[in-house]
Every structure is written in structure tokens, then in C-alpha cells.
């Protein structure tokens, strides 16, 4: 299901090992009279724990939809939308018109700055530098505005809110409005959507590797259990 959502970004869990129980300390002596130094020691690990979930904002493939309200960001940047009075950011550019003719996301969040399409509009044109223009049947301009793109020093530090929305944190840094096509800021492609950046083949391979590791550990436990049962039976006999 994560392959199909517009603008979905994959994540990877990262782990760290827990504290170790020192059975034999490296560099200590044997204490058997020879005072030999133990070269490596013996530590027993107590497992691992998750430390973070890293979000990857690499670009996904582009799909040509032909819909004039579909906008794909070619390069870095986020659209800004208003969610319950707070600013949020998204790369999912599948916009709609609400009952007032205002550009909104599929969930009704208003694209910033707010742009309302006049009733007489017959065509909507968006240039790569974010200029959106509503035209009438005669080709005359009815309304226009600029759609800004925002970048972050550390986009991986954004907080995911679901529905392909993100909010700023102390780790992400503040949103910076950029100039389209300059300083690594992307441009806007009308009639296209950015799809998920999840690679099906890679995820299938990773799943198979994880499954094989699980099966190996399971068989090791079964073998150890069988050996323990055999030892108990031999002791009884």
C-alpha cells in the first residue's frame, strides 16, 4: 500500500545495542598464579532497541495525469498548507477545488497562499516558477498568484502528521521560502504527480533477507532445545 500514495516517503528504523554484561574483562589477569592477561574478554549483549526512524525524502517517479490541478515538485521543496490554523508541509500535489473555488488538498487543507479560482475560469496555467493564472474563455487573465516552495536544513527532522503532512521541529529548522530553480529549490510541473519513493524490488529483497534471518534464528533455538532435551534424557538414564 505504501507504493501507491502520492508523495509518500519511505522510512527506515535504526537500532542501537543495549548495555553489555562483562563476564571477563579485557586486560584483566587470570588469577591462576601465572597472571596471564586476558586479551579480549567476554561480554554478553542484552539485545537492541530502536533509536530513531529516519525518513528519506528522495524523489519518487513522476506520473503524467494531464490534470491541471496536479502539481509535482521537480527537486527539493514542499508546498505549504494550513491545517487547523497551523502551517504544515507536503509534497503531495494532488489539489482540488472546494465549494468556494479555493485550491485545497484531498482532505480539504487550503494551499498557501490561498488562491480562489473565479467562476468564469476556463483554464488554469501553472508555470515552473510557481505562477498560477486563471484564464477565461477569451484567454484573458482573471486571477493570478505565486505558489512558493519551502525547504529545510534537515528535512529528516520534520514530524510526520499522517496524510503526507509534516510540521517543523527544532531538528528540522524553520521553513525557508526559496526561489524556484535556484539554490537546490525545485520547480513545479503541472499535470504531473510525484509518486511514492518506495522501490518494490528493494523492499521485497529486504523482506526475504529478514525472513531468512528469522528462520535461521528459529532453527537455532529449536536445535538448542533438542540438544537440551537429549541431555536431560541421557542424565535420567
Segments the model singles out, each with a brief description of its role:
Residues 1-237:
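Amphipathic alpha-helical polymerization modules
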Amino acid at each position: 500500500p505504501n507504493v501507491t500514495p502520492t508523495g509518500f516517503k519511505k522510512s527506515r528504523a535504526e537500532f542501537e545495542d543495549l548495555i553489555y554484561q562483562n563476564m571477563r574483562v579485557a586486560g584483566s589477569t587470570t588469577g591462576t598464579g601465572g597472571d596471564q592477561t586476558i586479551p579480549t574478554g567476554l561480554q554478553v549483549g542484552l539485545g537492541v532497541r530502536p533509536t530513531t526512524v529516519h525518513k528519506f525524502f528522495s524523489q519518487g517517479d513522476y506520473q503524467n495525469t494531464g490534470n491541471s490541478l496536479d502539481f509535482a515538485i521537480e527537486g527539493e521543496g514542499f508546498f505549504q498548507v494550513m491545517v487547523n490554523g497551523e502551517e504544515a508541509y507536503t509534497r503531495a500535489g494532488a489539489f482540488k477545488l472546494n465549494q468556494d473555488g479555493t485550491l485545497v488538498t484531498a482532505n480539504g487543507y487550503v494551499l498557501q497562499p490561498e488562491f480562489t479560482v473565479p467562476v468564469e475560469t476556463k483554464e488554469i496555467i501553472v508555470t515552473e516558477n510557481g505562477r498560477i493564472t486563471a484564464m477565461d474563455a477569451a484567454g484573458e487573465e482573471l486571477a493570478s498568484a505565486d505558489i512558493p516552495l519551502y525547504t529545510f536544513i534537515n528535512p529528516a527532522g520534520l514530524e510526520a502528521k499522517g496524510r503526507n503532512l509534516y510540521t517543523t521541529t527544532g531538528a528540522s529548522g524553520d521553513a525557508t521560502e526559496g526561489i524556484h530553480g535556484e539554490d537546490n529549490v525545485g520547480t513545479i510541473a503541472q499535470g504531473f504527480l510525484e509518486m511514492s519513493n518506495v522501490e518494490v524490488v528493494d523492499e521485497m529483497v529486504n523482506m526475504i533477507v529478514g525472513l531468512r534471518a528469522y528462520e535461521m534464528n528459529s532453527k537455532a533455538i529449536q536445535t538448542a532445545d533438542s540438544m537440551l532435551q537429549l541431555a536431560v534424557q541421557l542424565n535420567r538414564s
